[in-house]
Amino acid sequence: MQKRNVYAVPDLPVKEIMQYFSEMEINIKASDILKPTPQSTQRIYEVLLEVYCGVKTSDLLPRINSGESIEAFEESLSCILLQKRMSGFLKRIGIDNFGLRDLVPDSRRLIGILSVVVNFSMFRDNKRHVYERVCQMNDEKLLLKNEIDEKVHNAKKELERCERDARKSIEEAKGVEEEISLLESELKDFYRHQRALVQETERSKTERNEYSDKLSSLKLMVLNLNQEITCLKTQIVSDPTKLMELLDEMRCLIAKESEIMKGLEVKRVGLKEKIEFMQVLKEDTMKAITLAISNREADKTIDKTNREISELEVQMKNLDSGINALKIRLNHVSRQISHIESKIFNLQDNDKRCSEEISAKLEKLKSNYGVVSDERNSIRGKIEENVRLTKSIEYELVKRRNEHANDITAIQSALCRLKDDVFNYFAEAKGIIDKTMSD
């Protein structure tokens, strides 16, 4: 079962209720409280809602220009809306049993409700400065919290942007590094190929020199043989057999020389092919030299790329330092938020403690109210007894006063009769005396 927030408020005198509402410029007559009607009761509730809640019941229901049934419907709906609004208002100040039956005129119930409203209004007026100060502090805290949240949000955005830039820079640096590594591998392959070409060129030069030396020696041998042939041609041969042997020997030598010449021709063709190949190698070498020159430009580009990488690394370091600064700032803001949250927690604890103290005081007041209520009932009983005694005494006093007045009246009438009798007696005596004196 839900705990009801109800505290007992004694009924205030009608005079005090009217005086308080007149100070608030609320026109409520004594007859509206002591002898309420449905119209006066509804008007009082509408005035209370307008003053304390800022709600006009006439604004809650749009008017429909139609027949009597629509007017009756609007009246019923306005009564229901008035009961709902008034029930919500009274629940907040401690009365949670306000229903449609309370719209029926009842002087005692109306005095009780107005007493609770006056008590709440007086308490609100007394604690208004505390409420306004707490509201101001709460608004300042909310404003500070919103500013801190906005700063944290902006810092997070800046941090995310820096992280994106850093990731982009890292990716670009990785791409540049991959391109540099690819260029380095291509350059190494090119250097290796150039080194192989240089070695092949040196070996071809060595072979060419060797073949040139062999060709020179062979040319010298041919020249010597030609000289010998010339010498032999000039010699005179006396013996034909020797001449035939010499011819055979010369034929053999010529055949050998022919074979040697064929071998030399083959070698010459091979050397010519070697020379052509060396020319091709020379052209390739020149191309390689041109490529080496272009490699220098590539080296310059690589150096420029390395410098850009260094600049990017410096920018990354700056971004890292900025990120660290933002993290420090974020930590500082987090500490401030924690400090504010701790303050809010302390304020909540203080509020809770104050609420507990107020609840304890209210419980104590409730218990004291029971004792005071008993004493008040006993005193009221004594007062009623005294009133009864006073009324009986007043009745006896009036009765005795009437009896005394009757006795006084009887005495006065008796005295008047006695006076008349004495006057008559003295008149008769005077007449007798006068008569006697005349005789």
Curated annotation (Swiss-Prot):
GO terms for biological process: attachment of mitotic spindle microtubules to kinetochore; cell division; kinetochore organization; meiotic chromosome segregation; mitotic spindle organization. Residues 136-233, 293-332 form a coiled coil. Belongs to the NUF2 family. Transmembrane segments: none annotated. It comes from Encephalitozoon cuniculi (strain GB-M1) (Microsporidian parasite). One of its GO terms (molecular function) is protein-containing complex binding. Acts as a component of the essential kinetochore-associated NDC80 complex, which is required for chromosome segregation and spindle checkpoint activity. Pfam families: Nuf2. Keywords: Cell cycle, Cell division, Centromere, Chromosome, Coiled coil, Kinetochore, Mitosis, Nucleus. Component of the NDC80 complex, which consists of at least NDC80 and NUF2. It is found in: Nucleus; Chromosome, Centromere, Kinetochore. This is Probable kinetochore protein NUF2. Its main location: nucleus. One of its GO terms (cellular component) is Ndc80 complex.
